[in-house]
Regions:
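Active-site clefts of carbohydrate-active enzymes
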Residues: 1-10
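Loop/helix patches that line or flank the sugar-binding groove of alpha-linked glycan CAZymes
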Residues: 9-135, 141-146
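Generic detection of short hydrophobic beta-strand segments and adjacent strand-loop junctions
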Residues: 52, 146-150, 176-178
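Short, flexible beta-strand-to-coil junctions
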Residues: 129-131, 163, 189-190
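Beta-strand residues in well-ordered beta-sheet regions across diverse protein folds
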Residues: 137-139, 149, 187
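Beta-strand-rich binding/interaction modules
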Residues: 145-164
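Solvent-exposed beta-strand/loop surfaces of large extracellular or lumenal domains
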Residues: 160-174
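C-terminal beta-strand-rich structural cap/linker in extracellular carbohydrate-active enzymes
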Residues: 171-190
Length: 190
């Protein structure tokens, strides 16, 4: 099995959303090393065991690749060192997604049901329920922003959000504004 970035054609926004999809599903999340920085790795087995991209100089802790391992000339998303300095990097996106998963255990433990009334256009919505707690996750899988009407759902609060393109996710009264490839996690208002 290859890494997510390759399946997403190294598109930063699609790769970020795919990471959120993985991390917001129930059960144990699995991140194969390098997934969080968008490393390539598909096809033959040696390419899946490439050295981790620690820095652009490739000389700090980098191991010798296995024979027949195809290393890219440039890192598709930059090295870890580069991404740590970029607030909008894939690595920082993964850190945010993991923090949300840890802060809202219903995401990892909850039973998933579709929220078909909120699925409009390219917005996918599902509810996670665990220990009498619920969250609703909405993901915009389109290249353009989307508005979602929540008026039939009562009072919900935007608990967390992930923006793939840096645009803010906003809940105005009963309308949720989701940018392209944006993810919102709603909790019932207290």
């Amino acid at each position: 099995m290859g890494r997510i970035a390759g399946f997403c054609s190294y598109d930063p926004m699609k790769t970020k959303l795919a990471g959120a999809m993985n991390l917001f599903m129930s059960g144990s999340a699995f991140i194969y090393y390098g997934e969080e920085i968008g490393m390539p790795g598909s096809g033959n087995d040696p390419s899946k065991r490439a050295p981790f991209f620690w820095n652009d100089a490739r000389d700090n802790g980098t191991t010798t690749p296995p024979p027949e391992c195809a290393l890219p000339e440039e890192y598709p998303f930059g090295s870890l060192e580069t991404q740590m300095a970029d607030d909008n990097s894939l690595w920082n996106y993964y850190r945010q997604a993991i923090a949300i998963r840890q802060a809202l255990p219903t995401l990892s433990h909850g039973r998933t049901t579709a929220e078909t009334a909120l699925n409009a256009g390219c917005v996918s919505a599902f509810r996670k329920t665990w220990n009498d707690q619920s969250v609703i996750v909405l993901m915009n899988i389109d290249t353009v922003a989307a508005s979602v009407d929540l008026s039939a759902y009562g009072d919900w609060t935007l608990a967390a959000s992930l923006s793939a393109d840096g645009n803010e996710i906003v809940l105005n009264d009963t309308t949720l504004e989701l940018p392209a490839f944006g993810t919102a996690v709603l909790i019932p208002s207290v």
